[in-house]
Amino acid sequence: MSLIALPLRLLRLLPAITSTWVLAFALDEHLIFGTWVQPSLRESANANLPAWWTTGGLRWRWILIVVYPINYALGVVNLFVGRDELRATGAMSWYTIGLLFSLAHMGYMRTALDRIGMIERGVPRGNVTSSMESWLRMNRTRALVTDLPAWICFVTAALKAL
């Protein structure tokens, strides 16, 4: 492999890498945030969850602000670099569909923000864990409907393109 081909190979692989990060983040959210709704923690969770979520959101929002747009940008760039090669290998449609699934993640933004707002405000009072359970269900659905298919498409695209 020549040094000239290396940047193109890396470009082809990067959407698979960033979508792996997105999918891993969704899994981490589910595993970590799901702890708050365990029966043994419910009472303290109802008291502490709003402050924890508000503080935590400031710490992990950089992933949302940086990684997701990078994932979208890499998907788009791949569609415009070496288009003939992508068509010949059949990777073009996989990158396109992967990008669409990845962008579909943002279709859940209003629902996610509404549920996060309820958690931060401690709604319903005395049972905020029910709002967390609602957010967790939405997050699981979003990951299975958008993030996992995007990852599958980007990995398939990279395998075809490389």
UniProtKB/Swiss-Prot annotation:
Subcellular location per the Swiss-Prot or TrEMBL entry: Membrane
Glycosylation sites noted in the Swiss-Prot or TrEMBL record: N127, N139
Enzyme superclass (EC): oxidoreductase
GO MF assignments: oxidoreductase activity
Main subcellular location of this protein, as a coarse class: membrane
Membrane topology per record: Multi-pass membrane protein
Residues annotated as signal peptide: 1-26
Superkingdom of origin: Eukaryota
This protein's GO CC annotations: membrane
Stretches that traverse the bilayer: 62-82, 89-109
Its EC number(s): 1.14.-.-
Sorted UniProt keywords: Glycoprotein, Membrane, Oxidoreductase, Signal, Transmembrane, Transmembrane helix, Virulence
Pathway: Mycotoxin biosynthesis
Protein's job: Epoxidase; part of the gene cluster that mediates the biosynthesis of pyrrocidines, fungal natural products containing a macrocyclic para-cyclophane connected to a decahydrofluorene ring system that show potent antibiotic activities toward Gram-negative bacteria. Within the pathway, pydX functions synergistically with pydB, pydE and pydZ to form the cyclophane.
Similarity annotation: Belongs to the epoxidase xenD family.
Name of the protein in its database record: Epoxidase pydX
Recorded name of the encoding gene: pydX
